[in-house]
Amino acid sequence: MDASTLLARLEAATASFRNLERQLADPDVAADPTRLEKIARERARLEPLVLDFEELQVLEGEQKQSRELLKECRGDAAMEELAQDDLASLNRRHAELTEKLTVALLPRDPRDERSVMLEIRAGAGGDEACIWAGDLARMYERYSQKLGWNVQPISSNEADLGGFRELILSVKGDSVFSQLKFEAGVHRVQRVPATESQGRVHTSTATVAVMPEADAVEVQLDPKDLEISTARSGGAGGQNVNKVETAVDLLHKPSGIRVFCTQERSQLQNRERALEILRAKLLEQEQREAAARESSDRRAQVGSGDRSEKIRTYNYKDNRTTDHRLGRNFSLDPVLDGQLEDLIGACIAEEQRQKLEALSQQNED
């Protein structure tokens, strides 16, 4: 991004920020909680950008003064050296801020702010794959809890020996998709299963899909396309067990997507949950098809969301987690404990690097 384009975008962002501040002072906005929250969130997103831009402008003034001082010091070796050091320090900070601001102005995924449906499916490996799916679920639950996100299971198919054949978690919070989108793909584990009597290492897999939540306006469903049936659900015990048909089996006939929801206590709640899951699945399917139409370079990027991509291997023997997209290793135990900050942070940095590279190529063209 050239200097004039960067300046124009920063000035536009600052103008938007000032406008949002004026709106927050409007009594009509204060009386509308939904609108107020949306404006406050956008203001909070822009504030660091505006503050950095203000610092950049101050720096440019200091650079000008430093260059003038350097001219005045010609002939005084000691003063000239001090002035050169000062100018070099200012130039370094200016370069750092310019890069930071350029990254902040890169095109944003409009889905980044959304909550998600996190689907984990056992893959190859039989019972051990189901147990591994359960381990991944705990990893994401711990990570989400550390960030203050709300995590709830909304659909599950438990395995006989522990874990899950399939599990869908609702993860609600600020900018959930912006981080968890990097988890989509095949997660492979290499370890000795608890059921292995010979001590042999087995390789099992689980697939993670990260689906941004979709509302009823964004994904409209035709009732004629839906086939809904009910079944008995275990419930919470006592008289409700296996006596009331609260479970909902939902089939979307055009896509063949089926959703079975049993987590809620009433049939109406399970029906709403099933429709929520279906909308998220249909939106994700539409986005995957759109991505498939793009170039292979785009699909290879970090965070592309390809659920068939083998993204990570968890090796218990060596206490190592390898992210194949990054070509980097991380300590296994902290990762399984939900300490994903370094790993996801590295994915975000790589995505930004790829975007900057693409932007640079566009400028050259």
From Swiss-Prot:
<dbReference type="Pfam" id="PF00472">
    <property type="entry name" value="RF-1"/>
</dbReference>
<dbReference type="InterPro" id="IPR000352">
    <property type="entry name" value="Pep_chain_release_fac_I"/>
</dbReference>
<dbReference type="InterPro" id="IPR045853">
    <property type="entry name" value="Pep_chain_release_fac_I_sf"/>
</dbReference>
<keyword id="KW-0648">Protein biosynthesis</keyword>
<keyword id="KW-0963">Cytoplasm</keyword>
<dbReference type="InterPro" id="IPR004373">
    <property type="entry name" value="RF-1"/>
</dbReference>
<dbReference type="InterPro" id="IPR050057">
    <property type="entry name" value="Prokaryotic/Mito_RF"/>
</dbReference>
<comment type="function">
    <text>Peptide chain release factor 1 directs the termination of translation in response to the peptide chain termination codons UAG and UAA.</text>
</comment>
<keyword id="KW-0488">Methylation</keyword>
<dbReference type="InterPro" id="IPR005139">
    <property type="entry name" value="PCRF"/>
</dbReference>
<dbReference type="GO" id="GO:0016149">
    <property type="term" value="F:translation release factor activity, codon specific"/>
</dbReference>
<feature type="region of interest" description="Disordered">
    <location>
        <begin position="289"/>
        <end position="316"/>
    </location>
</feature>
<feature type="modified residue" description="N5-methylglutamine">
    <location>
        <position position="239"/>
    </location>
</feature>
<dbReference type="Pfam" id="PF03462">
    <property type="entry name" value="PCRF"/>
</dbReference>
<dbReference type="GO" id="GO:0005737">
    <property type="term" value="C:cytoplasm"/>
</dbReference>
<protein>
    <recommendedName>
        <fullName>Peptide chain release factor 1</fullName>
    </recommendedName>
</protein>
<comment type="similarity">
    <text>Belongs to the prokaryotic/mitochondrial release factor family.</text>
</comment>
